Amino acid sequence: MKIKKIKNFSTINQAERFAKKNIRKGTFDWLQAGAENGFTRNKNIKDLENLKILPKVLKGIKDTKISTNIFGFKISSPLILAPMGHQTQFHSRGEVETAMAFNDQSRLAFFSTQGRMSLRDIRRKNKNAIIGWEIFPFGDKKWIEKEIKDAEKFKCFSICFCLDANVRSHRY
């Protein structure tokens, strides 16, 4: 899949229009659909539509440092990248490329067994990234133990389990 060079976007809508033009329809629909029946996605959209920033609340703030400490790391902002599976649908090196944005050790990122790039590949190209590893327990006990050992071997700061998806979704 050949995608035009990605531009800087000012809005989510601009990024969405770009993606819709440049990604295969089935892949774009999958990206937009949300898990299972889309309940969480739709609720999140509704909640975000009700969120308002009141400028007077931020009036007079001169120091906008938002860095914080979490899990023993000083990070540049309290935002953490949640794991997203199947990124290779959108870029041939998927999670490896995403992790590059976290290689400066100022932000936390989670990746998961639902990705198509191995933890080994992600870490090989991103030695300094602060990475957490999420395990979907679809495999047997031996496989899960291997994933835990790999997370330790590749110096993940955290290991977590996705326990609400112990069976594969009916949508895929």
Predicted features, each with a name:
Residues 115-117, 135-139, 165:
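Short, acidic/turn-prone active-site loops that include or flank metal/cofactor-
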Residues 80-92, 133-142:
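Active-site mouth loops of central-metabolism enzymes
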Residues 2-72, 171:
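An N-cap/entry alpha-helix motif that binds or orients negatively charged groups
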Residues 94-132:
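A glycine-rich phosphate/pyrophosphate-binding beta-strand-loop-alpha-helix module
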Residues 24, 81, 102, 161:
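Conserved, mostly hydrophobic/aromatic
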Residues 36-39, 89-94:
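A structural motif shared across PLP-dependent enzymes of the aminotransferase-like
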Residues 79-82, 107-111, 131-135, 159:
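Hydrophobic faces of well-ordered beta-strands that scaffold small-molecule active sites
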Residues 86, 100, 125, 141-172:
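Alpha/beta enzyme core
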